[in-house]
Amino acid sequence: MLTLLIPVDGSDYSRRAVDYAIRRAAATQGPTRVHLLNVQAPIVTVNVKLFVSQESLETYYREEGTKALADTLALAQKAGLETHPHIGVGDAARVVLDYAAEKAVDEIVMGSHGRGALAGALVGSVAQKVVHGASIPVVLVK
């Protein structure tokens, strides 16, 4: 079974990565498992815990992650892929690399840029860090 990890952030690049994975799965002889991973940046301020409970933060991350995953999850499910959505919190590249190792995925498929990308950048910073840190193939989708 081919196992893919697709980091998604709700951007058009994420959708294109899922489109690529659907085509890749169709060309593969056998089933494909797709892990869709959204990574929320941690809210880090000096006194955040004085004003917001840990439960409220976790609810916020879950709600934002669910929104970011919605379109790509529906697209992958409609294509008949076995999907496993997940929401992580932390440094995006580190969370992606750790998740890929934990789930023993075969390949990471991700957009070359995300929501926070600079318009003139050739490759987004998260994508660049993942490419350099991964020990498995990484496909960047434009």
Positions of predicted regions on the chain:
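Amphipathic, non-transmembrane alpha-helical secondary structure
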Residues: R15-R23, A70, A93-L97, A101
